[in-house]
Amino acid sequence: PMFFESMQRLAEAYPGIPIDTDVGARAFLPLIAAGRPVGSCILGFDRPRGFSPEERTVLTALAGLIAQALKRAQRYDSESALARGLQNALLPLRLPEVDGVDTLGRYLSGTQGMDVGGDWYDVIDTGGELALVIGDVQGHGVAAAATMGQLRSAVRAFALNNYDPQEVISGTNRLLIDLDPGQFASCCYVALDPVTGVARAVRAGHPQPVLRRPDGRTEVLELPGGIVLGIDEQASYPVTEMRLEPGAMLALFTDGLIERPGTDIDEGIERVRATIERIGAVPLAETADQVTGEARAATDRPDDIAL
């Protein structure tokens, strides 16, 4: 640290430097964190003044605190950028095009913390069926995004090898327990035959989906399900078979869309159902815009959202 009682003293120490000698004292404080410079702090005063030993000690200590805070902020920015890049790389760039079925996915990051969570969606063309997937890994940040990527890859591998829906979820559950004991995730997996409209659905601790029928009636599908993934390797996940008629629309979403302070999840799901019923049979993009409209407009979104 360097302390100059006046700009005249600074000019004497560094002759030839353009200096406004009409202003006061200056304190130049290097910001050092973990033995490396991360910046500098310059304190200016409007008049000449001396710096007592106590003041110099306090200002030097203050510079140390600023350096640590700046270092943490830089690390946070780096980790946040890494997590966002990881998640963007893992979410599908495009969804498969299959005759008779229109699909659309949306993702909104949270506005708190790392801004990146473990929500994901996927649509997988298995050759005979179309697998619709929505999932949510506990937590936020790089770890959640990394776990999400592993689970998404596992689900895709099981699906592309024509595993039954129950086997897909059971296998993913065992994988998560092996990968990270103590971590858990929810998931809903629907295997749809695009020709017959027959769908087989499995739910693991995930919010119930919403179905709009061709006549406009909209309902919450009360799918029996198992516990979240990552808790019990012997957990069972029942399969529900249903038929989606031409013109029907199925909405899968994560809890970030339906959670609000002071309300329970069932109220949130009912809110989504009512919104879908109200807007009627419009293009999927418009439906997604209206369903997520309130969340997109919110300045405080504690959780990320996948639809």
Roles of regions detected by a PLM:
Residues 1-19:
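Regulatory sensory and allosteric helical modules in signal-transduction proteins
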Residues 55-58:
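Alpha-helical transmembrane segments within multi-pass membrane transporters and channels
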Residues 77-251, 289-290, 300-307:
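… and, occasionally, acidic/histidine-rich disordered N-termini of signaling adaptors
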Residues 169, 243-252, 257-307:
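C-terminal catalytic subdomain
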Residues 24-33, 240:
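A short, aliphatic-rich beta-strand micro-motif
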Residues 60-67:
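Allosteric cytosolic regulatory segments
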Residues 29-45, 254:
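Sensory-domain boundary capping and coupling elements
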Residues 17-23, 182:
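Short loop/turn motifs at secondary-structure junctions and domain boundaries
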